[in-house]
Amino acid sequence: TKNHFKFFFLMKDYTSDKNFTSKDFVENPLQKGEYENCTFNQCDFSGQDFSEIKFADCEFVECNLSLIKVVKTAFREVNFKDCKMFGIQFNDCNEFGLNFNFNGCLLNNSSFYKTAIKKTLFKNSKLIEVDFEECDLSNSSFSNCDLSGSIFLQTNLEKVDFRTSFNYSINPENNRLKKAKFSLSEVFGLLDRYDIEIEK
């Protein structure tokens, strides 16, 4: 009976293959539990507590996720598309299997401090004043992203592709840049600390 109750409890908290559209989760918060292969379209989660919720193979499209709390939240193979994601402390997430990608998202003032997020794709996104300090971004790609004011310090940027991104400032002396890719037109972002003038 004890095991039966445990099984029932786990099943109750597990949701799969469900599509949530135009839901206001500010008024009715998302139930704690595990979500697998679910899609969230045009939902409002702003300021909500995602702590200890597990998302696997899920997609968020045109959602407002600004200032959500993600303490021990699991994101495994999760895609965010055209989402508003201001001020999220991704460094609080469950590190096990942490894997996500961002396309067309606003991630301003968010933090990935000390996270290990290799092979992450950031595409067509704004990352204004985002904290990547001591983050492992190796083999990631920033495709057509605005990185104004973002912090790269003791960051592993090996094999990261910055070629189509802009407004970044990266000190080669304080970051690992082996085989990272940059475009000639934006490479001056590696020379900011030297206080030299470069004519385009």
Roles of regions detected by a PLM:
Residues 5, 10-200:
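Tandem repeat scaffolds
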